[in-house]
Amino acid sequence: MIQMNSYEGEGAYVIISLINPKGAYEKTLSVLGPDKQWYNTLKEWHKFQTKSNGKLSAITGASVGGGDRAMRTIEIDDAKLNKGYKLRFESAVEEQKYHVTDVEIPLTVESLAERANGKGYIRFVKLSKVQ
């Protein structure tokens, strides 16, 4: 679950990415924001996305407004746990600040059980394992 802070303006675009142990993007897991024309406002992710042939295979959906929450199901291979991988949540709002690491969660058993606080438009992220 992604809980947004209350803020003025358009809905936030949020990207959820798998970051490898070297700190590089490995895979886009989810995109919250429907219009491709705004993807370039998520600058670091957009660089990765254009280098990786531009074809987006992640789940996409609506942007998230201030104070709203969004639920997403993402698949993470258990082999990535406790190996130095992270989940990165990037956020951007039209004509406002871009947050490259609004939330970053280490892929450890302990971290996945805790609430992670955001630094920008995201108030917090809470993950739940689906059996």
Can you say where each PLM-predicted feature lies in the sequence?
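A short, structured loop/turn motif at beta-sheet edges
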Residues: 20-25, 77-85, 110
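Short amphipathic, basic-aromatic surface patches that mediate peripheral association
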Residues: 1-8
